[in-house]
């Protein structure tokens, strides 16, 4: 089993739900990315999603767009992100790392070269936002051959055919985008999420992580009641944007620990 599969199997055995925080590599400071990744793990992350900055992040809201712009301005590239993962792996061989980004940087490197470099760095999963599952069979096969889980998005608007297409190519987990629009949007409707997850699980035999619109411990706990994992990104990127640099890692770890406690509370049966 992959590191991601092992993580979700352990969570299921313990009756717990997963916490998947996202940060953008290189933001606010490329020299601090590995430290921030360790802060996420120390706060209780089960999987870390590491954003690969891109100049036109069409699925992302203004908070993550700004983080991409800052990282690119400081020279962050796909190669430097892979170096960050490799340095993280020197201390942490347990926490899975998923790269989340767009097709263009991967295609510039070439899928085969990327798969080899990502494997060697210690990457566990890849989510390419603009790769539709129907057109991703070759890419997904190359990732799996390198021991990397190809992860795909589903949304409230996803048809049964799209869900089935994801089921044919995805492994690790599925990321369910709980809202129409871009990351960071508000007005989360947990009941609508609960209604969609059975349709996903009937066609995709994988854990379902839910993200977009989760901003605090209360919403994280509510989502954990119905999903296998909670994905949170914009709120963390905003925290880093506003934090005093010397305090950023500690504040990040503290906020993630609050989310962890809330999610663990949701996973426990009532006394």
Swiss-Prot record:
<dbReference type="InterPro" id="IPR013785">
    <property type="entry name" value="Aldolase_TIM"/>
</dbReference>
<comment type="subunit">
    <text>Tetramer of two alpha and two beta chains.</text>
</comment>
<keyword id="KW-0057">Aromatic amino acid biosynthesis</keyword>
<comment type="similarity">
    <text>Belongs to the TrpA family.</text>
</comment>
<feature type="active site" description="Proton acceptor">
    <location>
        <position position="49"/>
    </location>
</feature>
<keyword id="KW-0028">Amino-acid biosynthesis</keyword>
<dbReference type="InterPro" id="IPR018204">
    <property type="entry name" value="Trp_synthase_alpha_AS"/>
</dbReference>
<keyword id="KW-0822">Tryptophan biosynthesis</keyword>
<keyword id="KW-0456">Lyase</keyword>
<feature type="active site" description="Proton acceptor">
    <location>
        <position position="60"/>
    </location>
</feature>
<dbReference type="GO" id="GO:0005829">
    <property type="term" value="C:cytosol"/>
</dbReference>
<protein>
    <recommendedName>
        <fullName>Tryptophan synthase alpha chain</fullName>
        <ecNumber>4.2.1.20</ecNumber>
    </recommendedName>
</protein>
<comment type="function">
    <text>The alpha subunit is responsible for the aldol cleavage of indoleglycerol phosphate to indole and glyceraldehyde 3-phosphate.</text>
</comment>
<dbReference type="InterPro" id="IPR002028">
    <property type="entry name" value="Trp_synthase_suA"/>
</dbReference>
<dbReference type="GO" id="GO:0004834">
    <property type="term" value="F:tryptophan synthase activity"/>
</dbReference>
<dbReference type="Pfam" id="PF00290">
    <property type="entry name" value="Trp_syntA"/>
</dbReference>
<comment type="pathway">
    <text>Amino-acid biosynthesis; L-tryptophan biosynthesis; L-tryptophan from chorismate: step 5/5.</text>
</comment>
<dbReference type="InterPro" id="IPR011060">
    <property type="entry name" value="RibuloseP-bd_barrel"/>
</dbReference>
